[in-house]
Amino acid sequence: MAIRGTIVMIHGMWCGSWTWDRYAAFLEGRGWRCLRPVLRYHDADPADPPDPRLGETSLLDYAADLQSYIRGLDGPPVLLGHSMGGLLATMLAARGLAKAAVLLTPAWPSGVNALTPAVIRSFLGVLVQPRFWKIPVRLGYRGAVYAMLGSLPPGERRPTYDRLVHESGRAIAEIGLWFLDPRRASRVDADAIGCPVLLVSASDDRLAPASAVRKTAAFLGPGFTLREFPNCGHWVVGAPGWREKLDDNKRQA
């Protein structure tokens, strides 16, 4: 089978390349070359203490690592990002590093007011930790189910949670509290994006609500495609119906 192109799959908060296991198998079976880089300090055993340097790792550090990775390829790939990975894909697209970008339930860039009661509750376990923006943080099980994993069958929630690692408190602050970040690390120059972009929201998402994805699409401006998956939460990478959603998503893209 001839290779149709290269997809760089960018995982989200607390995750790793395993997030894309199902998507990669599906897309590779249809001729795509799928690459799954792991964000800095995320290639870790969830049972081990996190690297303390993770706590102050910036979105800009993640983006710089991914930029170096992509520049080592033969040409600009399609970027497929989930959650924070969707925001990183947007940042990279604005740097001219994407042939196209698909953003699944993406985190929002600076300038988008996305805080809702559900978002605040989703991050509450992080926000209550003293100086959370300087330490590695991880959601508790109940918080993760509320924010991310609620659309999974009950029997899959704990095994999925047990694979989650710590995340950078700084990166979380740069997204959720962008208005307090003097560097605006989550800033995206929408005018610099020269490739097709598809944004996908989920109707029942609490972590990156459909309302926030719509605001992000409006912020980016005309020319970007927006779709919404019904009856689905944040974990679009593995919840029931993921195969049908991805197949439909690829046809629309």
Model-inferred region functions:
Residues 97-134, 171-180:
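Flexible "cap/lid" loop of the alpha/beta hydrolase fold
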Residues 193, 199-201, 205:
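Short beta-strand/loop motif that positions the catalytic acidic residue
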Residues 118-162, 171:
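Helix-rich cap/lid subdomain of alpha/beta-hydrolase
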Residues 80-85, 89:
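Gly/Ala-rich beta-loop-alpha elbow adjacent to hydrolase catalytic centers
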Residues 27-50:
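Conserved alpha/beta-hydrolase
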Residues 12-15, 83, 203:
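Active-site glycine-rich loops that stabilize anionic/oxyanionic intermediates
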Residues 223-253:
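Catalytic active-site module of serine/aspartate enzymes centered on a nucleophile-bearing elbow/loop
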Residues 206-212:
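Conserved alpha/beta-hydrolase "acid-adjacent" motif
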